[in-house]
Each structure stands twice: as C-alpha cells, then as structure tokens.
C-alpha cells in the first residue's frame, strides 16, 4: 500500500531528526499483525533489547518521549498531507 510506505518514510524521517540512532531504512514485508488492515499501517522498530547500548537508551524516559513525539509528529504530518490531497489542494 503506497500510503503505508509514505507513512513509514515520514516516521523514519522524524526519528532521524530527533534520535542519534542508525537508520535501518524502510522495509516491506507481509507482517502477520498488519495483514488485512484497511488503513495505512506500519510496524515501527526503534531498537533492539539484544543490543546493550540500545537497551540502555530504551530504558530512559526522555528517549521514549522523543520516540513518541517523533511518531506523533509524523502521523500528524501524514494526516495533514492526506487531507490536502483528498481536498484537491
């Protein structure tokens, strides 16, 4: 779904702006949890607990807040863009 890919790219861009983490890019796969959804959907992975440095970051409240704000900002941007497209602007 093109919209899902667009949303994923915007989320990745926002995460890149706010976090000092490796950009592993946007990938597509038939994730079971996303199959059958009728709306744009993405699976966001922001780190791996198997990586000690990432685990340490994921335990920090400020880091989790930055992740949440990045995702919120991306969804807001995506929604505003879609509304303009649907309105013919």
Language-model-derived ranges and their functions:
Residues 1-89:
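Active-site-proximal helix/loop segments of hydrolytic enzymes
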């Amino acid at each position: 779904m093109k919209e899902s890919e667009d949303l994923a790219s915007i989320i990745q861009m926002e995460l890149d702006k706010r976090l000092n983490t490796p950009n592993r890019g946007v990938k597509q796969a038939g994730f079971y949890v996303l199959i059958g959804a009728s709306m744009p959907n993405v699976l966001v992975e922001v780190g791996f607990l198997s990586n000690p440095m990432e685990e340490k970051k994921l335990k920090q409240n400020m880091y989790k807040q930055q992740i949440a704000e990045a995702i919120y900002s991306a969804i807001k941007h995506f929604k505003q863009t879609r509304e303009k497209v649907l309105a013919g602007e």
